[in-house]
Amino acid sequence: MCGQDFDFGGRDDGRVEEAACSVKNTNPREREQLLDEFGFGAIRRLSDDFNDMEANEMLCELYRMQVRRVVTDPHTAEGLLPYDYPLGCKRIAFDTDYYETFNQNAVTLVDLRREALETITPRGAKTEKADYEFDCLVYATG
Protein backbone atom coordinates (compact mmCIF):
# COMPACT_ATOMS: atom_id res chain seq x y z
CA MET A 1 0.00 0.00 0.00
CA CYS A 2 1.20 3.50 -0.72
CA GLY A 3 2.29 5.14 2.51
CA GLN A 4 3.99 8.44 1.77
CA ASP A 5 1.90 11.58 1.98
CA PHE A 6 3.21 14.55 -0.02
CA ASP A 7 1.87 17.82 -1.32
CA PHE A 8 1.70 18.83 -4.96
CA GLY A 9 5.04 20.61 -4.64
CA GLY A 10 6.53 17.19 -3.95
CA ARG A 11 7.71 17.98 -0.42
CA ASP A 12 7.53 15.23 2.16
CA ASP A 13 5.43 16.10 5.19
CA GLY A 14 7.54 13.94 7.49
CA ARG A 15 5.13 10.99 7.76
CA VAL A 16 6.96 8.62 5.43
CA GLU A 17 6.00 5.03 6.14
CA GLU A 18 7.00 3.52 2.82
CA ALA A 19 7.73 4.79 -0.66
CA ALA A 20 4.85 6.40 -2.56
CA CYS A 21 3.70 4.50 -5.62
CA SER A 22 2.38 5.32 -9.05
CA VAL A 23 -1.36 5.12 -9.60
CA LYS A 24 -0.54 3.05 -12.70
CA ASN A 25 1.05 0.42 -10.44
CA THR A 26 -2.08 -0.02 -8.35
CA ASN A 27 -5.12 -2.11 -9.13
CA PRO A 28 -8.75 -1.00 -8.65
CA ARG A 29 -9.00 -2.83 -5.31
CA GLU A 30 -5.89 -1.07 -3.97
CA ARG A 31 -7.26 2.29 -5.08
CA GLU A 32 -10.56 1.56 -3.29
CA GLN A 33 -8.59 0.66 -0.16
CA LEU A 34 -6.73 3.96 -0.36
CA LEU A 35 -10.05 5.83 -0.54
CA ASP A 36 -11.42 3.80 2.37
CA GLU A 37 -8.41 4.61 4.52
CA PHE A 38 -7.45 8.14 3.47
CA GLY A 39 -10.42 9.69 1.63
CA PHE A 40 -9.22 12.57 -0.53
CA GLY A 41 -5.75 12.09 0.98
CA ALA A 42 -5.43 8.93 -1.11
CA ILE A 43 -4.45 11.07 -4.09
CA ARG A 44 -1.58 12.59 -2.14
CA ARG A 45 -0.24 9.10 -1.51
CA LEU A 46 0.36 8.46 -5.19
CA SER A 47 3.61 9.73 -6.65
CA ASP A 48 2.53 10.51 -10.20
CA ASP A 49 3.93 13.89 -11.12
CA PHE A 50 0.99 14.93 -13.31
CA ASN A 51 3.07 14.86 -16.51
CA ASP A 52 1.53 11.53 -17.53
CA MET A 53 -2.01 12.17 -18.80
CA GLU A 54 -3.02 8.51 -18.47
CA ALA A 55 -1.96 8.51 -14.81
CA ASN A 56 -3.63 11.90 -14.32
CA GLU A 57 -6.93 10.57 -15.66
CA MET A 58 -6.66 7.64 -13.25
CA LEU A 59 -6.13 10.12 -10.40
CA CYS A 60 -9.11 12.17 -11.65
CA GLU A 61 -11.28 9.06 -11.53
CA LEU A 62 -10.08 8.32 -8.00
CA TYR A 63 -10.98 11.90 -7.05
CA ARG A 64 -14.40 11.53 -8.72
CA MET A 65 -15.03 8.33 -6.79
CA GLN A 66 -14.36 10.11 -3.51
CA VAL A 67 -16.59 13.09 -4.39
CA ARG A 68 -19.39 10.63 -5.17
CA ARG A 69 -18.82 8.97 -1.79
CA VAL A 70 -19.01 12.27 0.11
CA VAL A 71 -21.75 14.20 -1.74
CA THR A 72 -25.03 12.36 -1.13
CA ASP A 73 -27.01 13.79 -4.06
CA PRO A 74 -25.75 12.20 -7.31
CA HIS A 75 -26.79 15.19 -9.46
CA THR A 76 -24.89 17.61 -7.21
CA ALA A 77 -21.89 15.30 -7.08
CA GLU A 78 -21.73 15.14 -10.88
CA GLY A 79 -21.67 18.94 -11.04
CA LEU A 80 -18.59 18.99 -8.83
CA LEU A 81 -16.52 16.46 -10.76
CA PRO A 82 -13.44 17.37 -12.82
CA TYR A 83 -13.96 16.20 -16.41
CA ASP A 84 -12.69 18.98 -18.65
CA TYR A 85 -9.25 19.60 -17.13
CA PRO A 86 -6.44 17.52 -15.62
CA LEU A 87 -6.23 17.11 -11.86
CA GLY A 88 -3.98 19.80 -10.44
CA CYS A 89 -4.87 22.47 -13.03
CA LYS A 90 -7.43 24.00 -10.69
CA ARG A 91 -7.30 24.22 -6.93
CA ILE A 92 -8.16 20.90 -5.33
CA ALA A 93 -10.37 21.03 -2.24
CA PHE A 94 -8.99 18.28 -0.01
CA ASP A 95 -9.25 19.23 3.63
CA THR A 96 -11.82 21.97 4.11
CA ASP A 97 -15.07 19.96 4.31
CA TYR A 98 -15.87 21.67 1.01
CA TYR A 99 -17.70 18.67 -0.42
CA GLU A 100 -19.52 17.87 2.83
CA THR A 101 -21.00 21.38 2.67
CA PHE A 102 -23.08 20.37 -0.36
CA ASN A 103 -24.99 17.87 1.83
CA GLN A 104 -26.51 20.70 3.89
CA ASN A 105 -30.14 21.61 3.18
CA ALA A 106 -29.36 25.32 2.90
CA VAL A 107 -26.66 24.81 0.23
CA THR A 108 -27.40 24.56 -3.49
CA LEU A 109 -24.87 24.04 -6.25
CA VAL A 110 -25.60 26.17 -9.29
CA ASP A 111 -23.48 24.53 -11.97
CA LEU A 112 -22.81 27.17 -14.60
CA ARG A 113 -21.74 24.42 -16.99
CA ARG A 114 -25.41 23.31 -16.96
CA GLU A 115 -27.18 26.66 -16.79
CA ALA A 116 -25.72 30.00 -17.82
CA LEU A 117 -25.69 32.90 -15.38
CA GLU A 118 -27.73 35.79 -16.75
CA THR A 119 -27.43 38.37 -13.98
CA ILE A 120 -26.82 39.01 -10.30
CA THR A 121 -30.00 40.44 -8.77
CA PRO A 122 -30.55 42.41 -5.54
CA ARG A 123 -31.81 39.20 -3.86
CA GLY A 124 -29.61 36.59 -5.55
CA ALA A 125 -28.95 35.49 -9.11
CA LYS A 126 -30.83 34.60 -12.27
CA THR A 127 -29.73 31.80 -14.57
CA GLU A 128 -31.29 30.70 -17.82
CA LYS A 129 -33.23 28.06 -15.84
CA ALA A 130 -34.13 29.64 -12.49
CA ASP A 131 -34.05 32.55 -10.08
CA TYR A 132 -32.09 31.92 -6.89
CA GLU A 133 -32.51 33.93 -3.70
CA PHE A 134 -29.74 33.77 -1.14
CA ASP A 135 -27.89 35.63 1.58
CA CYS A 136 -24.39 34.71 0.45
CA LEU A 137 -22.85 34.14 -2.97
CA VAL A 138 -19.62 32.15 -3.22
CA TYR A 139 -17.65 32.58 -6.42
CA ALA A 140 -15.50 29.50 -6.96
CA THR A 141 -13.25 30.08 -9.94
CA GLY A 142 -10.88 27.16 -9.42
What is each PLM-predicted segment?
Residues 1-142:
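N-terminal FAD-binding dinucleotide-binding subdomain shared by FAD-dependent oxidases/monooxygenases
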